[in-house]
A protein has these predicted regions:
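Conserved adenine-nucleotide phosphate-binding loops and their immediately adjacent elements
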Residues: 3, 7-51, 62
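Winged-helix-like regulatory helical subdomains adjacent to P-loop NTPase cores
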Residues: 36, 43, 65, 78, ...
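Post-nucleotide-binding-loop coupling segment downstream of the phosphate-binding loop, primarily
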Residues: 38, 44, 48-52, 58-130
C-alpha cells in the first residue's frame, strides 16, 4: 500500500477523530508538542491563536528562527485534536515552493505534474463544506516575488495560518512573535539545565538574560542542555558564553 493511501484510511475513514485530514501527517506540526508544564511564557499568544482560529481569516505568524512559531502552531493543532474541534485540516511543510509543497503533502492527488497537483490541492481547500477548513503552512521562507504560487493563498475561502520569518504576505494579517518575558526565559533555561541553581547562579542567569542574544528560546534550551552535559558547572558555562558568544551578539 502507498503511504498516502494508508494515511487516508487511518485519518479520513475511521471514526476515531473529529478532524478530517486533507494531507499526510508528514509536517513538523505533527511532531510531539511540548507538554503544557514545559511550555513557558506563551499563554497569551496561544489564546490569541485560538481566537484567530474561531474568527477565521488569514494570518502570518512572523518571527526570527527559533523564537517558537512552529511550537505555537503545534500547541494549537494539539489543542484542536484534544478538544475534538470538528474541522478539515491541511498541514503543509513548505519546501522549495508552494506548488512542490502541496504536491508532496495533499492526499488523493491524481495529476501527473506538480502544477496539476498544486491546483488539485487548491481545489480541495476551496470546496464548500459544512466543516471549517484550515490550512497550516509551516516555515514559508520566500517572498511572493520568489514564489508566485503564494499569491493564490489570499483568494482561498479557508482559514490559513502561515509561519515564516517574512514580515508581510499579501492578504494576510501579520501576528508578530517576540521573545517571552524574562521570567519565562529563565524557566526555559532552568528546565533544560536539569540542576537546581543557587541564588547566586540565578542572579548570574538574570544578568545574561539582559542581553538580546540570550532572549531566544531555542538558544536557551541548547545552552541549558550544554550546561548540564558538557560544561559541568556554572562558572565554566558563564565563562564560555562570555568568551565565545560576544561576536555572535
Amino acid at each position: 500500500l502507498k503511504p498516502k493511501h494508508i494515511w487516508n484510511c487511518i485519518y479520513q475513514n475511521s471514526g476515531e477523530t473529529r478532524q478530517s485530514f486533507l494531507t499526510l501527517r508528514n509536517c513538523e506540526l505533527f511532531r510531539k508538542s511540548v507538554k503544557a508544564s514545559h511550555f513557558f511564557g506563551r499563554e497569551e499568544e496561544l489564546y490569541d491563536l485560538k481566537e484567530m482560529f474561531f474568527n477565521s481569516g488569514k494570518y502570518l505568524i512572523s518571527g526570527i528562527g527559533g523564537i517558537g512559531k512552529t511550537e505555537l502552531m503545534r500547541q494549537l493543532v494539539s489543542w484542536i485534536e484534544q478538544e475534538e474541534v470538528k474541522c478539515r485540516i491541511a498541514a503543509v511543510q513548505y519546501e522549495e515552493n508552494l506548488a512542490v509543497s502541496f504536491s508532496r503533502s495533499f492526499l488523493n492527488l491524481t495529476g501527473e505534474s506538480v502544477e496539476e497537483r498544486f491546483h488539485e490541492g487548491i481545489y480541495h481547500l476551496s470546496e464548500e463544506h459544512q466543516e471549517k477548513t484550515v490550512l497550516f503552512l509551516d516555515n514559508m521562507n520566500h517572498t511572493e516575488e520568489e514564489d508566485p504560487y503564494l499569491s493564490e493563498l489570499k483568494d482561498l475561502p479557508c482559514t490559513i495560518f502561515v509561519t515564516s520569518r517574512q514580515k508581510h504576505l499579501d492578504g494576510f494579517t501579520t501576528f508578530g512573535i517576540k521573545a517571552p518575558q524574562k521570567s519565562a526565559l529563565s524557566l526555559i533555561f532552568r528546565d533544560n539545565y536539569n540542576k537546581i541553581l543557587s541564588r547566586e547562579e540565578k542572579d548570574r542567569l538574570s544578568r545574561l538574560l539582559e542581553k538580546e542574544i540570550f532572549q531566544h528560546p531555542l538558544t536557551l534550551k541548547l545552552l541549558g542542555k550544554a550546561g548540564t552535559y558538557y560544561f559541568g558547572n556554572w562558572d565554566y558555562l558563564e565563562e564560555e558564553l562570555q568568551n565565545n558568544w560576544n561576536d555572535v551578539a
